[in-house]
Amino acid sequence: MPDDVVASDLDQEVRRDLLTLDKANADRVARHLVMVAQLLDSDPELALAHARAARERASRVGLVRETAGIAAYNAGEWQEALTELRAARRINGGTSLLPLIADAERGLGRPERAIEIARSEDHGLVEAARC
């Protein structure tokens, strides 16, 4: 990892999610997350390697699992993306990751499951609007 990559390069709100980790580990994880952000479009495989390193150090942090899922998705690693995105959704809640989860299912050759997930999201949004 380049020496000029520092934890403070990561958005303060994002770093707040790492407060459950000890300082040294949080710093290392933050630096890996910075690298993921920098490499995601230009080198998806290397971005995924950094996301995996962050996940190994902070597997119970929803943001880290979400980042690992997005990196795997960008690298075309559909099963890994699905695993990580589902874990992030369990940790964080919400429906914002459902489109990526559905598309990962499609990438695995399960378009029916993708449609089912998309419909469940639509149903959830309709129910929320009724409240």
Language-model-derived ranges and their functions:
Residues 22-56, 67:
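Alpha-helical segment of the N-proximal tetratricopeptide repeat
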Residues 100-131:
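Histidine/lysine/aspartate-rich catalytic loop segments that bind and position anionic ligands
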Residues 64, 97-98:
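TPR alpha-solenoid repeat register
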Residues 19-24, 52-60, 86-93, 120-128:
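Solenoid-like repeat scaffolds
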Residues 38-39, 71, 102-104:
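Residue-level signature for tetratricopeptide repeat
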Residues 40-42, 75, 108:
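Structural motif corresponding to the intra-repeat A-B loop/turn of tetratricopeptide repeats
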Residues 1-31:
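N-terminal leader/linker segments that initiate helical-solenoid repeat arrays
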